[in-house]
Every structure is written in C-alpha cells, then in structure tokens.
Amino acid sequence: MRIYTVGGAVRDRLLGLPVKDRDHVVVGSTPEAMVQLGYRPVGKDFPVFLHPVTHEEYALARTERKTGKGYKGFQVHADPEVTLEQDLARRDLTINAIAEDEHGNLIDPYHGVADLHAKVLRHVSPAFCEDPVRILRVARFAARFVEFSVADETMTLMRHMVEDGEVDALVPERVWQELAKGLMEQRPSRMFEVLRACGALKRLLPELDRLFGVPQTAKYHPEIDTGVHVMLVIDYAARAGFSLPVRFAALTHDLGKGTTPAHILPRHIGHEERSVELLQSLVKRLRVPNDCKDLALLVAKHHGKVHQVGEMKAATVLRFLQETDALRQPGRFRDFLSACEADARGRTGFEQQALPLFPLLLEILQLVRTVDAGAIAREQSSPDAIKEAVFSARVAAMEAAYRFPLKEAVG
C-alpha cells in the first residue's frame, strides 16, 4: 500500500498558497484492508475513507469510464492494480494532477508543474470532455488564479463540448454549486468571461449572456456595455468582501436591460420590472437558495430608487424603507445597500464615488425602529388608525432628527 497527497493541496503548496484541504490517493489496497486499518468508509459512488485521526480523505486509486451524458454518467473501477498514473489521468487539469509521496517527491506525469510556472489551465487528456462540470471548474479556477489563462486546446475542447450539448445535461444544483463558488473567488468576472468564450454562458445563463453588447447611456455608464458593467459590479463586490447573496444580487440586478426594446436604447425604461421577471425564472431553474433569491429580487426591483432617496420627503423615504421590508429585516437591507454600492461603483471612473446617503439611510432606519409602535397601537381604536398613527410618529421622528430632502443634509 502506497499513499500520495494529490490535487489542490499539492497545487496550492507549490503556488505558495495556504493549504486548506488535503486529499490522498491510496495505491495497492482494498476497501477491506482500509477498514481493518481503522479508516471509516464514506464514499457512496467510489471507495473514499476518512483517516481515523486526521479525518482527511483517502480514496483508493481508480479509473472512470463514460457510460452516459452528464457528470453522473460514469462507471468507476477501483482495484489494487490501478496505478497512480492511471488515477491522475482522470483528473481535470494538469495543475490538479500532481502527486506527492511521503518524502516530498513529486510525481508529475502530465507536466502540471510546468503549467503552474507558465500559468496555464490545461486539460490532462481527451477524457476531459466526458464530464461537463469541468467546464464550470475551469471557469472557476480562472476566477481564482487570475494570472492564469486557459490553454487554446482546452478552450477548443470546451467549445466542442458545448456544441455537442454536454452542458445541457448538467443538473441545476451542480450548476448553482459551481457558480456560487466562482462568485466567491478573487475575480468572479473571469469565470463568466471563460463561460462566454466557450459558449456555455449562453446555454446556462442566457439572461446574463444577452447583456453583452447592449448599450447604456454614456453619461451614467462610461463603460457603455451592460455586460461589462455587470462584470465590474461583481468584481467590486468581490474586492469589498461582500457575501454570496450580495454578489449574486450584483450579478443579476440588470437582467432586464437585455430585453430592452431596441428603439429606446440606450435608455432602459422599466428594466427593473423586466429584471424581476427574468430573475424569477432563473432562480427557479437553478434552484437558487432563498437567501440569494430574496435579496436578488429585492435589488433587481429597487436598486434604481435608492439613488432618488436624496430628493424624497421624509414620508417617501419611510415608504421606501417599508417597500424594501427594512424595518423587519434590517440585516437584509444592509445587504441591499451593499449590492447598490457595488452597482454604483462598478462603473468606469466611479470606483471611488462617495455614497453619503447610504450610511444616512441606515441611521434613519435605526431611528425609525426605535419608535414604540406597540405603545402607539394601544391608544388607537382600529387597525387603520394604528397604521396611520405609527407612520406619522415615525415621520415625525425622522423630521425631528434630519433635514429633508436629504440631499441638503449631505451637501
């Protein structure tokens, strides 16, 4: 029995990055032998075990054979006769197909070290095309390793996979899983650039793909292209360290601009409503989790109005806080403002734009939530009277503390 560290742990160590998870391949063993040594079996589809002390994953060396479409259409063969080189051959990229033995010696049959030095994402073998998830993984690695480029022959293979309909067989949960990981990488825009370059974006996220080439008013969007704007927005969200729900909302806030009637371009009247409609279909199709879905819909619907707050009377500002459910969900409202911040600063030349109204809105929200609605309600005789009295008390508190319209308060 021989044990090797493989995959991301070896890759990241060679890149000088922190090693998070360590995976191992075991050559020349059987499931029975692993159990006898105290390893705990956890693999459902192939033999994977947890170390009795470290709880790191140890997988028996295996080969895979394509038996059908999609990422589940595989037959796995694990056997003591399977060699390390055979196991590494089934990996997606050369930089992930490097092994290290217990003495620190590298086993690199597919020249992954050379590709690390050259900063190239290259497929190990033609078997790459058997698993469409690998297209998403390559795109995600491009977002993580921002100095790496996709090898020409790998991009060509990915295009052929898309043309052959392989990505159409992907299950929604797996698409979302990879997109979510990619959005949390260093430069998410690179994931979508790679997916667009190979044609996968049009198949997986047509609502996003059609934004590229759609013009916006140059005065407000010097970058002009709506798709370029969205890429700037998600990269700003990444630099700011915003959460996944905020990044997903940033990605999808302008989907409606892709269906703006040509005769009104570069204006996008009513794009918020169209964005909501497209987004409802997208989140249902990909089975997006509720926290991401709810924030994205909120941002798509209201992101334009937040920039009008400075012109509003106190009562109108309060209605805006009610429309966004800020009083009941202040944490989500903060996330809403974060996505709007990314939208405002994700524009060429506006990266450092001051947004004084945003912290002011949070102050006003905090003030409004201190108004004792319960005490006011006890003095009223009907639900309508309660609603009106509470609203009036909140407006009075706002006007006592701030000068409206707020644009005068912030200069």
From Swiss-Prot:
Record-annotated HD domain positions: 226-327
PROSITE patterns associated with the record: HD
SS bond list: none
Record's cofactor remark: Magnesium is required for nucleotidyltransferase activity. Nickel for phosphatase activity.
UniProt entry keywords in alphabetical sequence: ATP-binding, Hydrolase, Magnesium, Metal-binding, Multifunctional enzyme, Nickel, Nucleotide-binding, Nucleotidyltransferase, RNA repair, RNA-binding, Transferase, tRNA processing
GO molecular function, one term: CCA tRNA nucleotidyltransferase activity
One Pfam family per UniProt: PolyA_pol
E.C. designation(s): 2.7.7.72, 3.1.3.-, 3.1.4.-
Main function: Catalyzes the addition and repair of the essential 3'-terminal CCA sequence in tRNAs without using a nucleic acid template. Adds these three nucleotides in the order of C, C, and A to the tRNA nucleotide-73, using CTP and ATP as substrates and producing inorganic pyrophosphate. tRNA 3'-terminal CCA addition is required both for tRNA processing and repair. Also involved in tRNA surveillance by mediating tandem CCA addition to generate a CCACCA at the 3' terminus of unstable tRNAs. While stable tRNAs receive only 3'-terminal CCA, unstable tRNAs are marked with CCACCA and rapidly degraded.
Family designation: Belongs to the tRNA nucleotidyltransferase/poly(A) polymerase family. Bacterial CCA-adding enzyme type 1 subfamily.
Descriptive protein name: Multifunctional CCA protein
Native source species: Methylobacillus flagellatus (strain ATCC 51484 / DSM 6875 / VKM B-1610 / KT)
